[in-house]
């Protein structure tokens, strides 16, 4: 599996001590230069390869700046240029743009579920990390999505509704 990361997934995964786990199940992990510049106090692990864009890609990013940040645009362009399996973006507009361009998109939540699917995390650990992100680190997920993920990971044992 080959991915390009945007800034927010790197930050969110770092906050729940999961960034380093990606190396256990993803072959090639890339980030564009703009993402590295946006990280400020975060140190990028050596397994994340920083790749510059082509001159054409740079020109596209400069012309497209506006509703999306430079890091998001560079991640999308880099994903196209090096033909990755997923571009990892959390921002809805960035995800929609990437999908319109034919890219497969995953977010931080998807990466945590991928880690669980690959048995790098167990279901309970994955759920705890998702809870930490939503309760302590300002990641917004709708209550409906949280419930779906909880059931997917932990089963229906927490459902307190009873039918009569």
Language model regions located:
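A generic short alpha-helical patch detector that favors 3-5-residue windows
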Residues: 103-104, 121
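A general alpha-helix detector
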Residues: 78, 111, 129-132
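Long, charged alpha-helical interface segments
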Residues: 118-164
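Short active-site-adjacent structural elements
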Residues: 96-97, 123
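Short alpha-helix plus adjacent loop in nuclease-associated cores
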Residues: 109-120
């Amino acid at each position: 599996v080959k991915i390009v990361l945007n800034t927010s997934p790197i930050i969110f995964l770092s906050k729940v001590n999961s960034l380093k786990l990606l190396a256990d199940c993803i072959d090639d992990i890339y980030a564009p230069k703009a993402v590295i510049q946006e990280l400020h106090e975060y140190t990028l692990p050596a397994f994340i390869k920083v790749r510059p864009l082509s001159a054409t890609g740079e020109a596209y990013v400069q012309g497209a700046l506006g509703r999306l940040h430079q890091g998001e645009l560079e991640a999308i362009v880099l994903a196209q240029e090096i033909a990755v399996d997923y571009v990892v973006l959390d921002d809805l507009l960035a995800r929609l743009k990437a999908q319109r361009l034919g890219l497969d998109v995953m977010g931080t939540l998807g990466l945590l579920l991928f880690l669980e699917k690959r048995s790098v995390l167990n279901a309970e650990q994955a759920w705890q990390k998702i809870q930490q992100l939503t309760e302590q680190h300002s990641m917004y997920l709708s209550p409906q999505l949280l419930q779906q993920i909880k059931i997917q990971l932990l089963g229906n044992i927490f459902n307190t509704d009873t039918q009569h």
